[in-house]
Each structure stands twice: as C-alpha cells, then as structure tokens.
Amino acid sequence: MLKPVRFAHTKPYWQVLILILLPLQMPERTLLQAGESSSSATSSSKHQSDTATPQIFSADFENASYGIYTKEQLSLDWNNPSWSDGIEEKRVSVVATNRGSRALAVTFPAHTYGPEKNGAVWRLKFDASYPAVEARFDVMFKQGFGFARGGKLPGLFGGKGNTGGDKPTGKDGFSARMMWREDGRAVQYLYYPDQPDRYGHQIPWIDPTTGKQIKFQPGQWHTVVHQLAINTPEKNNGTLRAFFDGKIVLDIDNLRFRDTDDFAIDGFLLSTFFGGGDASWQTTAEEILFFDNFRIRKIPN
C-alpha cells in the first residue's frame, strides 16, 4: 500500500456562472482584506515587521464586484503584479458560490491549452523574503469537470520562480506549484536544482489512511495547504509539507532549493491552465474552476 510521500450564450458568461453556482441571494458581507488598499497590512505583505501578526497576504473577494475581474482589481488585491495572463482576456470573474460567499472563477475555453489561451497566471510578489511560509486556499472544480491530461495549480516560489522547462541552477530560483492529472489526481509540481528532468518533478499526494493517491472531486470544495521552508544554501535540508482537507499528504525534508542566500521564499504564483505544451493537453469543452480564501503566513523555520 502506498504511503504519504517522504524523501526520506446570450448572457455574459460571468452571469451564467452566478446562476450556476448560487441558489440566488448574493451576500453583501464586506470582509475583503486583499483589496482594502495598497497600503493595507493585509493587502499584501505589509505586516512582515510585526512579530505579533505573521500574516503575509489574504484574499477572500467579499468586497469585489460581481462580474469580470479587472486589471485594476487584480492590482489592488495582489500587490500590483507586473504582468498577467487571463485578466485582459476576461477569463477570470468574481461569482457567488453555493456556500454564501464570493470566489474567483477561472474559465478554460474549449479546445485550448497553455496560459496564453487558457486559464490565468500572475505572481504575488512579497515585500520581503521569508525562510518559511504557509500558503492555503480553497479550490473547487465545477461539477462534471473534464480533467483531460492535467493542468497547473498555484504554489510558492523564490527568485525568478522557474517554470516552463527552465531547470533551476541553484542560483536563480525555484517554484513549488501543484498539478491535477488524469481523473483529478493531485501531484506536487516542483522546479528545483535536483529535479530529475527538464520539466517539473511530479510527486503524488497520498492519502495517509487509504494509501491511495489524492483526487480532486468535481463540485466539492477542497482546502489545500503548502508549508515550505527554504534550505541552507548548498545543503539538502529544505522541507515541503502539503495538506489536503486537513490530512497530511506530502512530507519531504531533504530538498535543495538554492545554493545562494540571494533569494528565499519570495512570492506566490497564481497559475492555472491546461498543459503541458501541446494539443494533447487541451480541453475538450469549456471548463471552470473556483478559488477562494487565500491565506499566506510566516511559520517557524
């Protein structure tokens, strides 16, 4: 039995989404923290000098207007990213959910793949580097979601946040995203100097109770948590732990993310698209997934 991995139409589509997701009655709560203002402590990374408040970032979209998620709202919520995919293309919306809150909905058009045509990507750059960080968020794939060959999900990064076949050297950066694979199987997707191939290292998430690989269930909210601690330069003592709906599903304690102290954990990569870099990864129909309740905080190293 496998064990948890140890290395040791006629309406705008956002209106249709609201009708799909909510048995009506849109809430009017105003709990948004990410978009309060660019100088707000909770809008990005303004509390890192406050030892009593380890929070780096939070976003729950309760103050965001329903409809297309604009470039202006992205800038306000996510510490002014320098670039993005999917925002100007209107593939991201704020919608009402079936649990009485607001969430981001990301659309993947039919017969597309890659971030230029499909999904959304941007980077939240922290205002400081951190040695150990926890990132958590809620995610739901729409009912009947067609997983195809798989696609990307968010995660932490450092330095230039290597992706796209850019294997880290130890002196440039790393990334620690996720993927879904066929049938919704969950894997960690790591770019780090010791990865075995050019493209990211896929490490299965394993249910500690059943020994089976974790799967995302369409139509159900899941809570994902990543806990990453950077290594001492040139040493294999970095750690990565992952939790799925409260269960630990990944525990690695011998990772080398860097050979220099020029970077540590520097940001969070909101990355979701089908692919893969060729048409074998494309969607077979329009698909949608939802994100909510992002929380990123410092943790003990």
Regions inferred by a protein language model and the residue ranges of each:
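Low-complexity, Ser/Thr/Pro/Gly-rich disordered linker/stalk regions
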Residues: 31, 35-301
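Membrane-interface motif at the C-terminal end of an N-terminal transmembrane signal
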Residues: 27-29
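N-terminal secretory signal peptides that target proteins for export/translocation
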Residues: 1-10
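N-terminal non-cleavable signal-anchor helices
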Residues: 6, 17-19, 93
